[in-house]
Swiss-Prot record:
Name of this protein: Large ribosomal subunit protein uL11
GO molecular function terms attached to this record: large ribosomal subunit rRNA binding; structural constituent of ribosome
SMART domains found in the cross-reference section: RL11 (SM00649)
Gene that specifies this protein: rplK
Post-translational modification: One or more lysine residues are methylated.
Extent of the signal sequence: none
């Protein structure tokens, strides 16, 4: 018989930097899950990923207090900032204050957008790469990025 699922926890955790402090500790503690077990497993799985990359993770909690977790690709905004050469660090660079008006926050090429769309394709809710490209283009414009050739 399959284990009974008691809930899901969605978090965005920096690669290789999971620790029991908020937001991870309280989110898992409420479900009665072993926080350190998750932190060790997550850090081991993300060891090969660039440290600090935000990784969306969905944790499935079971009635017997065990869990499984599934990692997704980093957010589109992370890929766009990286491709546009915007600062990514403790305090992430924000997009333009008024997208479409004034100076752009950065520049990104169509080729870079297609590459991001192909990477994110499994996580996006679309059928073709072209529709994924359109979604990424919209995100880039909303961030105040200028799309070139």
């Amino acid at each position: 018989m399959a284990k009974k699922i008691t809930g899901y926890v969605k978090l965005q955790v920096p690669a290789g930097a999971a620790n029991p402090s908020p937001p991870i500790g309280p989110a898992l503690g409420q479900r009665g899950l072993n926080i350190m077990e998750f932190c060790k497993a997550f850090n081991a799985k993300t060891a090969q990923i660039e440290k600090g990359t935000p990784i969306p993770v969905i944790i499935t909690a079971y009635q017997d207090r065990s869990f499984t977790f599934e990692m997704k690709q980093p957010p589109v905004s992370f890929f766009l900032k990286k491709a546009a050469g915007m600062k990514i660090g403790k305090k992430p660079a924000s997009g333009s204050k008024t997208p479409g008006k004034g100076a752009p926050a950065g520049r990104i090429s169509e080729a870079q957008i297609r590459e991001i769309a192909e990477k994110k394709m499994p996580d996006l809710n679309c059928d073709s790469v072209d529709s994924a490209v359109a979604m990424i283009r919209g995100s880039a414009r909303a961030m105040g990025l200028e799309i070139t050739g």
